[in-house]
Amino acid sequence: MKTAKRILALVLMATMLVSFAACSEQPAADDGKYTIGICQLVTHEALDAATKGFKDAVVEGLGEENVTFDEQNASNDTTMCKTITDNFATKKVDLIMANATPALTAAVTSTKDIPILGTSVTEYGVGLGIEDFNGTVGGNVSGTSDLAPLDQQAQMILDILPEAKKVGLLYCSAEPNSVYQVNKVKEFLDGKGITTAVYTFSDSSDVAIVAQKAADENDALYVPTDNTAAECSTAIYNAMTTKKPIIAGEQGICKGCGIATLSIDYYDLGVKTGEMAVEILKNGGDISTMAIEYTPQEKLTKMYNESICKELNIDVEALKNAGYVAIEQ
């Protein structure tokens, strides 16, 4: 009898331990506490601003005491992105914020259950390989796009640099969203009778030599929204022994090597992404029906780099009169 009682006690104890373990595996959101994993591809001004905006909006919506951020940086290593997002999935965080396309594609392969919000992703259809993309990813994925109107950026080349007849299109070949942007800008410029040439670098190791070649062979350059270019923007400018004007895809790149851009505000982009996170976590929003959010036209800003414009004898007063504002250095 004592043996039977001892066995029963052990069974009950084991059952209790399993129950406690099961309880500990429940998401922290059950008591209003949330853990959010942030995977940022690389450190540069635009992505940093998006992450800050995201965190500020989440804290505003959930309360600082109710959210813990597990913030990781992949140092521009796509393999590290996958390691980070796999770890988030193992930890069963309540939501993943993926900052930049490689972070998003990694997160999508790590989990089909945890909500994933992308930000600083230019074109979700291209990044995720979705044919006939209709604006909603579905499943456990949504987010915000940093795509600015490419035809308007291309038109800036014609407006600011009317004497430019040859334009080099410079970007990182490892970034599919850069290919998408360059193809659109090339199509626009070709239609206007401008001669275009494409120049690609594979990573930061060859960006300088490719940038110099592009500058030597063209009257002006276009650099799209591109994470490697953003990380190396100053190196791009310094590599040009003969300085040529660059129209940039966003203000961070323009700050390092460009004369002008039509840019979104990455902090505001992050804020919008954070508001989406609050809607999902606090209000029970259905991420599968959430369309990708884009910056409206009225929030885009025409910007110029005063120091580079002056160095290249670009008429700053004309830019001001056309509604351009100076980038803060």
Where are these regions (language model features)?
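Short beta-strand elements in bilobed, periplasmic/extracellular small-molecule ligand-binding domains
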Residues: 55, 60-81, 140, 186-204
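Hydrophobic alpha-helical segments within soluble ligand-binding/sensing domains
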Residues: 30, 124-166, 264-285
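Hinge/cleft segment of the Venus flytrap/periplasmic-binding protein
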Residues: 279-329
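Short, low-complexity disordered leader/linker segments with a strong preference
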Residues: 1-35, 60, 64
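An alpha-beta-alpha
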Residues: 36-38, 54, 142-189, 286, ...
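Beta-alpha junction/loop-to-helix N-cap segments that form part of ligand/metal-binding clefts
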Residues: 70-132, 226-249
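Pocket-lining segment of extracytoplasmic ligand-binding domains
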Residues: 176-244, 250
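Extracytoplasmic "Venus flytrap"
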Residues: 35-55, 61, 70-79, 174, ...
